[in-house]
Amino acid sequence: MNHSSNEKEPETIEPLRYLSKTEVATVETELLRDYRFGQQQLIEIWGHACAIAITKAFPLSSLSKKQPTLLVVCGPEQNGSIGLVCARHLRMFEYEPTIFYPKRSTLGLHQDFTVQCEKMDIPFLSYLPTEVQLLNDAYNLVIDAILGPETDHKDVKEPYAGMLVTLKQVKIPIVSVDVPSGWDADEPAKDGINPEVLISLTAPKKCATGFSGKHFLAGRFLPYDIQKKYELNLPEFPGTECIIEL
């Protein structure tokens, strides 16, 4: 069968780009400085998208325990605040989050997120049980919002080093925000926690190359010029969704 010479060639789909730590920092600086996004605004966008991803991966009807309990473990910097926002939205979606936030940030914008959770009567744990079975029995899953891409994975201090030891042993699923805690953002981990779900923010990081679990991307807010400049090749999000499963 002859094909006409003006028949369109199939479009080449460029592969999704995985960013290095340095590129992540550069993109975020550009968003804040040149595009006038606020840091609190970005944290809210990301936290809300994380909550949506969790509802997709673990719908209320799929949870094994009678109560839809979740444990959100928050670190001291931006990832921790994203965890706080995620917990607040999950509460609105009728889950029952509990937060463990051992070193609260002194920055006003992070404190705002803490107050919002407290005002919604989301409980805060005073300590993380080291007896893993207590966590397995009490919660359906753990949300790891401890350490972000900027963290030096070789220099994780207490209490976070001890928390990672505990989380490595839990039997319930772990959902990691952006970068699984304890991983180097630039390369897949040889040792570290093993999340069942990863939610990449803005664009996936190099460490997520070959990630075998369920992988979501929350990045449907990036100005097109930034997407083009960094050749991110983001996938087409379905409908009006703010997340996509990769």
Swiss-Prot record:
Residues 24-234 form the YjeF N-terminal domain. One of its GO terms (cellular component) is mitochondrion. It comes from the Eukaryota. The keyword Transport applies. Keywords: Lipid transport, Transport. Disruption phenotype: Morpholino knockdowns have a reduced number of nascent hematopoietic stem cells in the ventral dorsal aorta between 28 and 60 hours post-fertilization (hpf). Morpholino knockdowns show increased levels of free (unesterified) cholesterol. GO terms for biological process: hematopoietic stem cell proliferation; lipid transport; membrane raft distribution; negative regulation of angiogenesis; regulation of cholesterol efflux; regulation of Notch signaling pathway; sprouting angiogenesis. One of its GO terms (molecular function) is NAD(P)HX epimerase activity. InterPro entries: YjeF_N_dom, YjeF_N_dom_sf, YJEFN_prot_NAXE-like. It holds the Pfam family YjeF_N. PROSITE patterns: YJEF_N. Interacts with apoa1a. Binds to high-density lipoprotein. PANTHER family: NAD(P)H-HYDRATE EPIMERASE (PTHR13232), YJEF N-TERMINAL DOMAIN-CONTAINING PROTEIN 3 (PTHR13232:SF12). Accelerates cholesterol efflux from endothelial cells to high-density lipoprotein (HDL) and thereby regulates angiogenesis. Orchestrates hematopoietic stem and progenitor cell emergence from the hemogenic endothelium, a type of specialized endothelium manifesting hematopoietic potential. YJEFN3-mediated cholesterol efflux activates endothelial SREBF2, the master transcription factor for cholesterol biosynthesis, which in turn transactivates NOTCH and promotes hematopoietic stem and progenitor cell emergence. This is YjeF N-terminal domain-containing 3. The gene is yjefn3.
